[in-house]
Each structure stands twice: as structure tokens, then as C-alpha cells.
Amino acid sequence: MAVIKCKPTSPGRRHLVKVVNSDLHKGKPFAGLLAKKSKSGGRNNTGRITVRHIGGGHKQHYRLIDFKRNKDGIPAKVERLEYDPNRTANIALVLYADGERRYILAAKGMQAGDKIQSGIDAEIKSGNAMPLRNIPVGSVVHAVEMKPGKGAQIARSAGAYVQVIARDGAYATLRLRSGEMRKVPVDCRATLGEVGNAEHMLRQLGKAGAKRWRGVRPTVRGVAMNPVDHPHGGGEGRTSGGRHPVSPWGQPTKGYKTRSNKRTDKYIVRRRNKK
């Protein structure tokens, strides 16, 4: 995988930094694992905008990813690595010995032809999935479940990983990239190794149009709006907003704690590191 800085032959290419992966499949995705993906434009079922700055973009198919990795005891072969427009990580098309194909997240170092497996009897190597009770303490894992059988929820983006730092009774303690330490049931599954495509963080889109291709619309500053549109709006000439930064709905927007899930507080051993 190479990081290429383009020559400034135009304003849009002056700041363009591309991540080129020659190992990715050049053809179409596997049709049996595609699903329809409708555009919402950031609107909910009543037509109101619930997420700002969304709209347009290239048409996409959703790839059905196997986040449960519950096909135990059946070896699989990685057929190819593919680009997925729905996530930062690349995905791998795997063929199981019984003939079934599934998409999984491509682990760091995974290549076409690799053999992988799931279950308690799987070898301790990158790409294999098993319950946390069978993973050695100190191992680096990704695609971790929070509830047994629910499917992976933690460490799924490009370059992400979690470290297993302890195991005590029914729970394993994980250290997340944010610095948070969290308890997870030992029956939850995880995949060994890191998520691939870690160079994704080095890319630069280079121009606003590249954001539009991805369905991201412009973000307008509150101080550039009218008072009816934003708490920072209005005033004669340029202003600083006149108050601490808030969202369009008046909620403090820099460093304000919004988490209120007391039900799962008991599983957090240490909160994430402060920036």
C-alpha cells in the first residue's frame, strides 16, 4: 500500500494525497452479498433534518459484512480483498469449505490465499476469530462484541485495535485506543490482529468536490447565519458570536459531556484520556 502525493497540476490536485492499494480487487463486488442502500438526505421518517450536512453523493450498494464470525470449525480461504464505500476499512471475500461466501473486515497483513477460521479451536493468528476467553492476555484484537452473539461493535474502522489486558471470571478487560478501559463478557468474540488500511488516516481529499462525491454537504459557521438560524447569528459586521460556542439548539459544543448511560457505567473501569 502506497501513499502518493499528487503533482499540483490543478488547484484540486495540489493538496491531494491518495492511498493506493494494488492488492484490491478491480472488478465488481460479489452480487450475493449486496443490499440496497437508499439515500436519506439526513431526514427521518417525518421529513425533518436529523443529521446535518448529508445529501447527494455517488450511488452505493451496502456490503453485508459478517460481524458475528459464528461459522465455527469450518476453514475458509481469502479469495480477494475489496474496497468498501461504506467504511474506512477494506473487506475480504472469504470462501468456506462448505461453499458459502462471506465478507469480513480485512485484518492487517491479510492477503488473497490466506487461510482463516473461527471458533475455540482456531489457531492464534491474525484474522482468526474466537471468544475472548480463548485469547491470550496481551493480545491485540479488533471487531469485538459487547454482547455475546450480537456481532462486533468495537474497533471496526481502518487501523483500529483493542488490547486484552486482563481476564477475571466472567469478564475480560480491554484497553481501547482512546485510553478507556472497559469490561466485556469473556463469551464475546473478537478477531485477532488489527484492522487493515491503517494508511487511511494519511489521505487528503484535496478539494470540496471529493467530499460531495461521498455525500457530505458544506458546513456553515453559526456566526455567518441570521439570529433565527443559530444562537451565534446576527450582529452588525463580523462578530465573535458573543457567547461560549453552542450548537444550533443551544447545547454547549466544545468539551461538554453528553453521555448519560448509567446502565453501562459499571463496565467502564477507566474513562478515556482527556485531549
Curated annotation (Swiss-Prot):
Q: rRNA-binding among the record's keywords?
A: yes
The text of the family note is: Belongs to the universal ribosomal protein uL2 family.
InterPro entries, sorted = NA-bd_OB-fold (IPR012340), Rib_uL2_dom2 (IPR014722), Ribosomal_uL2 (IPR002171), Ribosomal_uL2_bac/org-type (IPR005880), Ribosomal_uL2_C (IPR022669), Ribosomal_uL2_CS (IPR022671), Ribosomal_uL2_dom3 (IPR014726), Ribosomal_uL2_RNA-bd_dom (IPR022666)
Q: Which PROSITE patterns match?
A: RIBOSOMAL_L2
Q: Which UniProt keywords apply?
A: Ribonucleoprotein, Ribosomal protein, RNA-binding, rRNA-binding
Q: Which residues are listed as membrane-spanning?
A: none
Recall the GO molecular function terms of this protein's record: rRNA binding; structural constituent of ribosome; transferase activity
Domain of life per record = Bacteria
Q: How does it assemble?
A: Part of the 50S ribosomal subunit. Forms a bridge to the 30S subunit in the 70S ribosome.
What this protein is reported to do is described as:
One of the primary rRNA binding proteins. Required for association of the 30S and 50S subunits to form the 70S ribosome, for tRNA binding and peptide bond formation. It has been suggested to have peptidyltransferase activity; this is somewhat controversial. Makes several contacts with the 16S rRNA in the 70S ribosome.
Any one Gene Ontology biological process term?
A: cytoplasmic translation
Which parts of this chain are annotated as the region Disordered? 223-275
GO-annotated cellular components: large ribosomal subunit
Cystine crosslinks: none
Q: Can you name this protein?
A: Large ribosomal subunit protein uL2
Pfam families in alphabetical order: Ribosomal_L2 (PF00181), Ribosomal_L2_C (PF03947)
